[in-house]
Amino acid sequence: KSDPERRFVVVSAPGKRNDEDTKVTDALIKYYKHYIKGADVKADQEWIINRYQAMVDELGFKSKEMVNISKAITDLATLPIEDNNFLYDTFLAAGEDNNAKLIAEYFRNNDIEARYVHPREAGILVSSEPGNARILPGSYDKLEELRESDEVLIIPGFFGVTSDNQICTFSRGG
């Protein structure tokens, strides 16, 4: 609110709340590993969903978006495992993606005109290199168009979309 010129917020996945806590990205990696092994993933799903719910509770608002976030987390376990080079990236990107949805809702609940923007809508097209995506040159023109928005745009970081519509992440920590 203090800077009306700020039009974009790029969101990371929730990190550690304390030294004993787990980053959501690390929890998603664990979930992915259990899923591809055919192990029970219910505890992984619940932990991640509860982590987002804890954020809502701490921020003190009633979230309608939690239904969609819960579904997005559980739906990861319905994706095909075989011949899916982008499965790991899709799991990892869920941290940023769901956090962006939640932050956009929080902003709106605090009288800030805000909108979640998926990297696909933002035009963040990337190379098809799982875990090491590179932004394609044409993306910058599309991103420039977003500056015309009157809303604060909440965009998940860490990933883009390939030309064949696959979620593809940048290198972790990069």
PLM regions with names:
Residues 1-174:
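Nucleotide/pyrophosphate-binding catalytic subdomain
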